[in-house]
Amino acid sequence: MKIAFIGEAVSGFGGMETVISNVIHTFENSSPKINCEMFFFCRNDKMDKAWLKEIKYAQSFSNIKLSFLRRAKHVYNFSQWLKETSPDIVICIDVISCLYANKARKKSGKHFTIFSWPHFSLDHKKHAECITYADYHLAISSGIKEQIMARGISAQDISVVYNPVSIKTVIVPPPERDKPAVFLYVGRLKFEGQKRVKDLFDGLARTTGEWQLHIIGDGSDFEKCQAYSRELGIEQRVIWYGWQSAPWQVVQQKIKNVTALLLTSAFEGFPMTLLEAMSYGIPCISSDCMSGPRDMIKPGLNGELYTPGAIDDFVGHLNRVISGEVKYQHDIIPGTIERFYDVLYFKNFNNAIFSKLQK
């Protein structure tokens, strides 16, 4: 059986790439009869390909400015590739690729099943309507399932598969009782927009009690975020690490104790930083944004949720943690995310695909 994963060029550094490569390697290791390849639609050859090690891939290049001509070239190139490779399944890692796959299927005369597998919120992406060109759908969160259904697709054609996280052997403990609370942010630094780091700083600036914030990540607003911390007078409590290739090693080796990971996003696809934190026993205080956090966080057990933009509620959660009024058992938190661990994830992903093929 041949499975093709297709999509527009990606950065090569994100969590999406990690998930895709893990899925491909797991499929191929599960059976010698399964062969996976990738096909990318590119404007240039700037994509970092280190993550594609041991993965066979092909590319279609077009930098034509007129979108309908650019798309026509991609469809033609992909249809030629389909004639050569004859996949049984095509999994689209973004929505525009559903359109390419559908048109190329007709053009090539090949028969295969198209799955969409979008990794971002549909309400914040262009061409979201193109998802209807797929036959079936793999949703990485219950929120994205709702977004797919809102575009006229039956719930029977959608499987919620989430994203996987590996089981850890280490628990990151909280600080000792007489020490300041230690908060953690891991991710891109966008002052407003998607990540709302401004809300993170505004909330912390309004808390009572002692705390530190450790920030692991970089982004276009790095300097703007630093300047805002100075403006609020909290710069002495914020420790900046910049981008790190192994952020959780930094947490274990340098930070060592964490009270909670914080996420103040306006929207997400499936924020893996929450799952990674909880796999180490770290509770998470997150906005209940579309989509992902509500699938992972069980309030009072492994963290808390608040309405995006509701800074008063966010501050309330922070104050209760800082004062010790609310405590979490770090050692039981990894058990609260059991359904996201690798073995169960791949079993569900496999079933989501092959159950549809048997129809």
From Swiss-Prot:
InterPro entries for this protein: Glyco_trans_1, Glyco_trans_4-like_N
Class of the enzyme per the UniProt entry, highest EC level: transferase
Pathway: Bacterial outer membrane biogenesis; LPS core biosynthesis
Reactions performed catalytically: alpha-D-Glc-(1->3)-[L-alpha-D-Hep-(1->7)]-4-O-PO3(2-)-L-alpha-D-Hep-(1->3)-4-O-PO3(2-)-L-alpha-D-Hep-(1->5)-[alpha-Kdo-(2->4)]-alpha-Kdo-(2->6)-lipid A + UDP-alpha-D-galactose = alpha-D-Gal-(1->6)-alpha-D-Glc-(1->3)-[L-alpha-D-Hep-(1->7)]-4-O-PO3(2-)-L-alpha-D-Hep-(1->3)-4-O-PO3(2-)-L-alpha-D-Hep-(1->5)-[alpha-Kdo-(2->4)]-alpha-Kdo-(2->6)-lipid A + UDP + H(+)
Domain of life the protein comes from: Bacteria
Keyword Glycosyltransferase: yes
Gene inactivation effect: Mutant lacks the alpha l,6-linked D-galactosyl residue of the core lipopolysaccharide. Deletion mutant shows a lower invasive capacity than the wild type, but the difference is not statistically significant.
GO process annotations (BP): lipopolysaccharide core region biosynthetic process
Amino-acid positions noted as binding UDP in the UniProt annotation, renumbered to this chain: 244, 276
GO molecular function list: glycosyltransferase activity
Keywords: Glycosyltransferase, Lipopolysaccharide biosynthesis, Transferase
EC id: 2.4.1.-
Family as reported in the entry's similarity comment: Belongs to the glycosyltransferase group 1 family. Glycosyltransferase 4 subfamily.
Job description of the protein: Galactosyltransferase involved in the biosynthesis of the core oligosaccharide region of lipopolysaccharide (LPS). Catalyzes the addition of galactose from UDP-galactose to the first glucose residue of the LPS outer core.
Descriptive protein name: Lipopolysaccharide 1,6-galactosyltransferase
Species per Swiss-Prot/TrEMBL record: Salmonella typhimurium (strain LT2 / SGSC1412 / ATCC 700720)
